[in-house]
From Swiss-Prot:
Main location as per UniProt: cytoplasm
Enzyme class: ligase
The protein's name: Histidine--tRNA ligase
Keywords: Aminoacyl-tRNA synthetase, ATP-binding, Cytoplasm, Ligase, Nucleotide-binding, Protein biosynthesis
Gene Ontology biological process terms from the UniProt entry: histidyl-tRNA aminoacylation
Compartments, record wording: Cytoplasm
Pfam families to which the protein is assigned, alphabetical: HGTP_anticodon, tRNA-synt_His
A GO CC annotation given for this chain: cytoplasm
Catalysis performed (reactions): tRNA(His) + L-histidine + ATP = L-histidyl-tRNA(His) + AMP + diphosphate + H(+)
Length: 426
């Protein structure tokens, strides 16, 4: 029986991994410009870490966990997201006492959620994210939103919409949630079974439900701004005012909530309008969060972060950009001589690779016409032809694939001639 990959996973190779690596390089470059430092945390953590900090009623905890017990009967879980893992690492390693504020980190790695696979959504998925820890000014949070927008700009992704909301403190949100419970109980019969179960557990999830969220009575539900304190209203107004001076266009969406319990204050989502992202259109999302550092054993610090799914970002990138695969080599070496000649050809390859040229060498085909035919698979800029006669005369034939011109070069001049060729070809 053939063993295949598990449902909701995928193999990454060929052109897709080239796109992945291109985006990864852009993300790392932008992270550096924002003075963000890379952090890596374990792929699995203690299950309690997520239950306490994501929220027992969240979909992740109730439906999507990949959890297990190890041989010592400890309850562990594959990470479904990485914010709490980063905060756990920061607190455990006392990084809050050895770094200037705000601490700025970025991460990229696999996450795991047991959910129905669809376009841009898998059970194992790659997530990039940033965390600003110890934020003291709302402008740092706007800077985080600009970071997200810069990613799209650098990747030439233009078909998107920025949505923002202000959801107040955790205490304010509790008042809002209690009001939503009473409100949605009046419409219980018009809700799906999932939403009925959410009324008491987490009615905020009804607002972004793919079916119920679009119903008129859901859109008319109580809004968070009705429960904000005077200070929160002032901060919300200031957030919008500052954002307007920096971002050309965005939508204030009073129904926007994030899926995890630790969020408070300003939140945002960037929604792709690409046709390739059917069913899942949010490509970047995040906002302010508090209580996590305190919950994990330190003082309470205001933090801000966002995350994006690489798979969704790749789909959005592909929709607007033509990707030219880099499957060509710089130099193809056609070795058509004896073993002694082949060893010299191998030495050519090693010398050129040490100079950072991309090289393919073929030892199997002994007829030059077959070597030329085979070289077409690699689209080389130069072909080096080396056989027994060349070995005897200490020379090699260089074929320029652009002009189809052949030149006979002495072996001791080869590296310089190759260098001259690529410098003139820039």
């Amino acid at each position: 029986m053939v063993i295949k990959k598990p449902r909701g996973t995928y193999d990454l190779f060929g052109e897709e991994i080239e796109v992945f690596n291109k985006i990864n390089d852009v993300l790392k470059t932008i992270s550096n410009t924002y003075n963000c430092h890379e952090i890596k945390t374990p792929i699995f953590e203690h299950k309690e870490l997520y239950i306490r900090n994501i929220g027992e009623s969240s979909d992740i905890v109730t439906k999507e966990f990949y959890d297990f017990k190890d041989k010592s009967d400890r309850e562990l879980a594959l990470r479904p997201e990485n914010t709490v893992g980063v905060i756990r690492s920061v607190v455990e390693n006392k990084l809050l006492y050895t770094n200037p504020f705000p601490l700025k980190f970025y991460y990229l790695g696999p996450m795991f959620r047991y959910e129905r696979p669809q376009s841009g959504r898998n059970r194992q998925f790659y997530q990039f994210g940033i965390e600003f820890i110890g934020v003291k000014n709302i402008l740092n949070e706007i800077e985080g939103i600009l970071f997200a927008l810069d990613i799209l700009k650098k990747l030439n992704i233009t078909n998107w919409k920025l949505k923002v909301n202000y959801i107040g403190s955790i205490e304010t949100r509790e008042k809002w949630i209690n009001s939503l419970k009473k409100y949605f109980n009046k419409y219980k019969d018009e809700l799906s079974e999932d939403s009925k179960n959410r009324i008491e557990k987490n009615p905020l999830r009804i607002l972004d439900d793919k079916v119920d969220g679009s119903k008129s009575f859901v859109k008319s539900c109580p809004k968070i701004e009705e429960f904000l304190t005077k200070e929160e209203k002032e901060e919300s107004d200031n957030f919008i005012k500052c954002l307007k001076t920096i971002v050309n266009e965005f939508e204030f969406d009073s129904t926007l909530v994030r899926g995890l319990d630790y969020y408070s204050g300003p939140v945002f989502e960037i929604v792709s309008q690409s046709n390739k992202l059917t069913g899942q259109s949010t490509i970047i999302g995040g906002g302010r969060y508090t209580k996590l550092t305190k919950e994990l054993g330190d003082n309470d610090y205001i933090c801000f972060g966002f995350a994006l799914g690489m798979e969704r970002l790749m789909l959005a990138y592909r929709d607007e950009n033509q990707f030219l695969s880099n499957n060509s080599v710089d130099v193809y070496i056609a070795s058509i001589g004896s073993v002694e000649s082949e060893l010299v050809a191998m030495n050519f390859a090693n010398q050129l690779r040490n100079l950072n040229y991309r090289v393919e060498v073929n030892f199997d085909l002994k007829k030059i016409d077959k070597q030329f035919k085979n070289s077409n698979k690699y689209n080389p800029k130069i072909i080096l032809i080396y056989g027994d006669e060349d070995h005897k005369n200490k020379q090699v034939t260089l074929k320029n694939q652009k002009t189809l011109e052949n030149k006979v070069i002495k072996l001791n001049e080869l590296n310089n001639k190759i260098k001259e060729f690529f410098e003139s070809d820039k």
